[in-house]
Each structure stands twice: as C-alpha cells, then as structure tokens.
C-alpha cells in the first residue's frame, strides 16, 4: 500500500517487461498491477487515489450472483435496487448521481450510458466478470465525460489456462449453468471461450404499490444467456494482439409502468440484446510501449406488454450503436512514466430511442496526457485532457495529486481534480429536450493519510465535491439549474488476526442540494461494511455485515411526488465452501441471514433470506 524507495522505477521495469495493456487482463503478478487509474500498468501501491481491485477468486468466495452484489461491498459505493436479480440498479459513488459514474468494459465505456445518462449494472451477467478495478474520485482528466464520482472497469478476459464448469441453484427458482475454457492452440496462441445461462422466477418486487405504477401481484423474474470468445496472439517479443466477441440476451419481468399514450397496454417486460466486438495490437520495446484498440457494440433494449409483443406501437425500443478507437502510448521518463493518447467515439441511435423522433449521431474526440514521477519521498501525479463533443463543444479537465511518505510506512496525500458530464441524447433531443444544454461540471478536493500500523493496513480520506450546472427537468423542459455540494469521510482497514482476515469500511457522506439544502435522494449518509474470512478444517468461511443508514426518496404515487424517509438497516450474509477434491468445490450461501425487510428504493422490496448452493469443477 505504501510507496517504497524506487517504487516508480520498479513500476517502469514491470511495465517494460509486461507491456502496457489497457483492455487486457493479462496474468498479474503478486504486486497487483492495474491499468485503470492512469491508463498505464502500475502497482496499486503507487496510486494516490483510493483504489480497489476485486478478483474472480473473491467473487467466487463471496458467491455473488449479480454485479450489484459485488459492488455494494466496496468503499464509497451505495446501490439503490428496484428488487432482486435483473431489476434496475442505480450506482452512487461518494454521493454523486448514478450518471456521474463512468462504467467501462475492458477499458471501453458502456454503450447505453450516452442515451440514458447512466449504466444499468443489473443487466451485466456476473459470469462475464473476471476482475473489477475501481477508483474513487474525479477521473475526467483521464477518461473524459461521466467520471465525476469515480470509475468502474469491468474486465472480462480470463487469466488461467484450463476448463471450469459451474452449476448453481437457489431460492426463487434460481439456477445457473456456466462453462469456460482457455487453451493453448499453438506456442503463441491462446483461445478462450465461455458460456452461461442464468434463470430465476423471482418474486413480487413491489411492496405496497407506492410507485406510481400498476400493482401486479406476480413474480418478477429474470433470464440471461451469455457467450464469450477470444483469441490472444503473440507475434514476436515486441508485438502481440487480440480479438474477442461477446454478447448476452436478457429478459426481465417487472411491475407495469403507466403508458399514457396507449392505456390499453401494461409494459412489464424488458428484453435486452447486447453485442460487443473488439480487437487490438500491442507493441513494447525498451522504454516505449503502445496499444491500438478498435471496438463496435450494438444494443437493442425493448420494453413491452407480452400480450401485444415487442413490435406493437405501445412498445418502446432503445437501439444504439457505438464505435470506439483508442490509441495509447507510454514512455519511461526520468523516475516515472508519461502516458498520452487519443480516444474517438461515435454513437448512433435509431429514431424512437428514448422518445427521440429522429435518428441521431454524436461524436467525441479526446486527447489526454498523464504523468507520474517519484522524487525521493514524494510522488507527483497529474493529468490533463481536452474533449471535443459534437454537441457540447470543447471541455478541458485536469487533476493533480501529491503523496509524501513523511515517515516509513506512512503517507500523506492531497489532490484536486475537475470533471464534467456531457448532456445525454435524451436530454437534448427527447421529450422536453434542450439542445442548448451545457455540460455538468465538478471540482473536488481530497486529503488523506494511509499507513501500516503493526498488522493493520489502513487509509482515511476526506473529500469535498462541488457540482454545478446540474441538468434538471422543470416546466416540461431540461435546464442547467441544479447545484450540489458533497462532503464525506471514509476509513478502510485490513488486518489478519490468527486464522481470521478482517476488512472494514466506515463512511459518512453529506450530499446536499445546494439550492434547497435537502439531502440528495437514495443516498445513505452512514455506512459500515465488514468482511470476515477464515478457514477451519478445510472449510472456507465468510461472514459479511453491512449497515445502511436512513435515506430519502420520493413517493411517485402522489402528484407532485412527496419526499419520504427510508429507515436504516443492518444485514448479514454467510458463505462456506469445501474442496471435495482438488477439482471439485462445493459452495453454499445464505443471503440476508436474519431475513431483514427493507427498501433502498421506495416501494420496491429487497429479497428476504435466500439460500444458494453451487458446485464448481475445474480441470
């Protein structure tokens, strides 16, 4: 965690040997090389911003069956869920809006975020996730629009040769079947293939009908099918490349929305079809490395009444295509690294998407420069980026950080950064659209101290985020009329005591509307997260505790919607696994152990106590 002497020199050595790779999750060494913070490979210990990595082994140990269940355990994260698996989930980082979180898949932003403004994590199959890199704080100076609260990078590439088969069952008719293999086709060629099918009957997610929709006392289930295929090729010692494709088809049932235009229909079914293709080439020689990636994704998102079908006039369709081109270069310079590159993105939507009457295309070109240097006991880090958005014009953001190891194993950190979010297509051209909207802008100050005290590795951070020109809906149109001010403090710690490993996060945020001084909705001011792991007689046990403080929401069953308070809650999860043989492992989980009844979105129930059983065979 703490910077050591010559840390950045070792970073450079590792990078030069391994090659810089933004989108590939190549085999990581024990010093946990990551790429998301500054778009070049570096050990976590050299990163000044708060950073968390979740590995596939941890996901298996937690036995998470959704991406939301993985992320809710992480520092600074708050999840507002409209029910169980597959139901809409909103991700808040450090109290910022869900649209202020940049979600990447293998370093490339998700397709639908440019339309709705935020990424719907509920639709990403958890079997697709092999690693998650998560950084808190502004990162627009590295990635451009959306990265106000933080960045989530979901990495899909598998890291281990071999084959794995998984079968699971659980409450509410849950079942999942998963298979993956990674094999060497030739000396320098590796093929990876994976598939998954997941289904749950679900449960009735609406608690009391207080959602402004129609009460439907039925099960709200979910089904997902996923395929992944990739090839990695090493051409020589300097050049390598990859090509991959993956896609998933999902079907989700929910309680009906009101369709004012076609009152005969009750849209309560969602079908999502997502396809993604990308390829890249990497070059590495001496102090220089480079990577070029191109990608294409296509998403179709239907909402309809099954009685009339998805092609009925009462149905809706969000149909979007996205093209990306990324070129990044990294240089060893003095006692550190400099990275520079260009991103290009083109997003096209068909007429009718998000109620936009005509097809639209937007383009964004970004140029960035990041650098990190070590000067004795100091680490200096900086980044600057300019984006040219075809609708929002030019936006330039920057950030700077300083770390000082004032005594051995203790470091002080200070940082400042700016960030922005461009208006979405629906805000500019949909119902109530305003093509004169300006980007939302933020300024964040952060200070922290981290250290190793005996067996305890810890960090405490305080931050302040001011966001202006927030886009809000008023008088039947979108305007830049909102402001928010967020203050927070978080403490994270990790310690081993005998056979027990403890991880603890304590966080407090004060997210307020600067105009009204009201607490922003669906954010808990206090959270405590605790993970306890231990091994006893070959059984691996895990106990998870989470406390969510009270939060506010809106009751949309009234007009105008009134503000309501949701109570706080504490809940536990228990997991256990046992290696029957060196190939076969059996895992079991009890989620919401004490069967707590609570809501993170007003009117939508979180599942009660649930049971899961999984078998994994690896060879």
UniProtKB/Swiss-Prot annotation:
Gene Ontology terms: biological process: monoatomic ion transport
InterPro entries listed in its UniProt record: B12_transptr_BtuB, Plug_dom, Plug_dom_sf, TonB-dep_rcpt-like, TonB-dep_rcpt_b-brl, TonB_box_CS, TonB_rcpt_b-brl_sf
Annotated transmembrane regions: 163-170, 174-183, 189-200, 222-232, 237-253, 270-284, 286-303, 316-332, 335-344, 360-376, 378-388, 392-407, 410-424, 441-450, 456-465, 478-495, 499-514, 522-534, 540-556, 563-577, 590-601, 607-619
Ranges spanned by the short sequence motif TonB C-terminal box, renumbered to the chain: 602-619
Principal place of residence: membrane
Domain TBDR plug: 43-157
Stored SUPFAM superfamilies: Porins (SSF56935)
A GO CC term assigned to this protein in UniProt: pore complex
Biological role stated in the UniProt entry: Involved in the active translocation of vitamin B12 (cyanocobalamin) across the outer membrane to the periplasmic space. It derives its energy for transport by interacting with the trans-periplasmic membrane protein TonB.
Family: Belongs to the TonB-dependent receptor family. BtuB (TC 1.B.14.3.1) subfamily.
Protein's UniProt name: Vitamin B12 transporter BtuB
Lineage of source species: Bacteria, Pseudomonadati, Pseudomonadota, Gammaproteobacteria, Enterobacterales
């Amino acid at each position: 965690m703490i910077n050591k002497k010559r840390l950045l020199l070792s970073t450079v050595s590792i990078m030069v040997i391994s090659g810089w790779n933004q989108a590939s999750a190549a085999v990581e060494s024990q010093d946990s090389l990551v790429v998301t913070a500054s778009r070049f490979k570096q050990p976590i210990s050299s990163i000044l911003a708060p950073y968390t990595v979740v590995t596939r082994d941890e996901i298996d140990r937690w036995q998470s069956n959704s991406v939301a269940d993985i992320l809710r355990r992480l520092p600074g994260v708050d999840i507002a869920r409209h029910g169980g698996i597959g139901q809409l989930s909103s991700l808040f980082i450090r109290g910022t809006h869900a649209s202020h979180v940049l979600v990447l898949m293998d370093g490339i932003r998700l397709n639908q975020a440019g339309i709705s403004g935020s990424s719907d994590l509920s639709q990403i199959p958890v079997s697709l996730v092999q690693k998650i890199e998560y950084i808190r704080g502004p990162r627009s100076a590295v990635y451009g629009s959306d990265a106000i609260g933080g960045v989530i990078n979901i990495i899909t590439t598998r890291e281990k040769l071999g084959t794995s088969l998984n079968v699971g069952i659980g409450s509410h008719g849950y079942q999942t079947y998963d298979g993956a293999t990674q094999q060497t086709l030739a000396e320098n060629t590796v093929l990876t293939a994976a598939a998954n099918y997941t289904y749950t009957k679900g449960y009735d997610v609406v608690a009391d009908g207080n959602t402004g929709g129609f009460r439907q006392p039925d099960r709200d289930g979910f089904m997902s099918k996923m395929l992944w295929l990739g090839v990695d090729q090493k051409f020589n010692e300097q050049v390598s490349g990859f090509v991959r494709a993956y896609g998933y088809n999902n079907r989700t049932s929910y309680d009906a929305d009101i369709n004012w235009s076609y009152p005969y229909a009750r849209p309560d079914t969602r079908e999502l079809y997502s396809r993604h293709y990308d390829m890249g080439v990497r070059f590495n020689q001496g102090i220089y490395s480079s990577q070029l990636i191109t990608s294409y994704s296509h998403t179709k998102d239907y909402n309809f009444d099954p009685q009339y079908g998805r092609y009925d006039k009462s149905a809706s369709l969000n149909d979007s295509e996205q093209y990306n081109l990324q070129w990044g270069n990294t240089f060893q310079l003095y006692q550190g690294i400099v990275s520079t590159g260009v991103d290009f993105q083109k997003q096209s939507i068909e007429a009718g998407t998000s109620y936009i009457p005509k097809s639209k295309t937007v383009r964004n070109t970004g140029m960035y420069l990041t650098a990190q240097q070590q000067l004795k006991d100091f680490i200096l880090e900086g980044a600057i980026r300019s984006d040219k958005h075809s609708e929002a014009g030019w936006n330039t953001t920057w950030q700077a950080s300083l770390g000082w190891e004032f005594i051995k194993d203790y470091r002080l950190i200070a940082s400042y950064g700016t960030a922005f979010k461009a208006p979405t297509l629906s805000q500019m051209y949909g119902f109530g659209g305003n093509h004169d909207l300006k980007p939302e802008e933020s300024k964040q100050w952060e200070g922290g101290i981290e250290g190793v005290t005996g067996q305890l590795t810890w960090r405490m951070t305080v931050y302040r985020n001011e966001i202006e020109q927030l886009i809000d809906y008023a008088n039947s149109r979108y305007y830049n009329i909102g402001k928010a001010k967020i203050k927070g403090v978080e403490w994270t710690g990790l310690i081993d005591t005998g056979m027990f490993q403890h991880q603890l996060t304590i966080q407090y945020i004060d997210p307020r509307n600067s105009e009204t001084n009201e607490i922003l909705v669906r954010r808990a001011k206090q959270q405590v997260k605790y993970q306890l792991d231990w091994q006893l007689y070959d059984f691996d046990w895990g106990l998870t505790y989470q406390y969510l403080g009270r939060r506010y929401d809106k009751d949309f069953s009234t007009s105008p919607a009134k503000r309501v308070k949701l109570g706080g809650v504490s809940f536990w999860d228990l997991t256990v696994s046992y290696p029957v043989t060196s190939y076969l492992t059996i895992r079991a989980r009890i989620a919401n152990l004490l069967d707590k009844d609570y809501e993170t979105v007003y009117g939508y129930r979180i599942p009660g106590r649930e049971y899961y059983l999984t078998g994994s065979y690896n060879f």
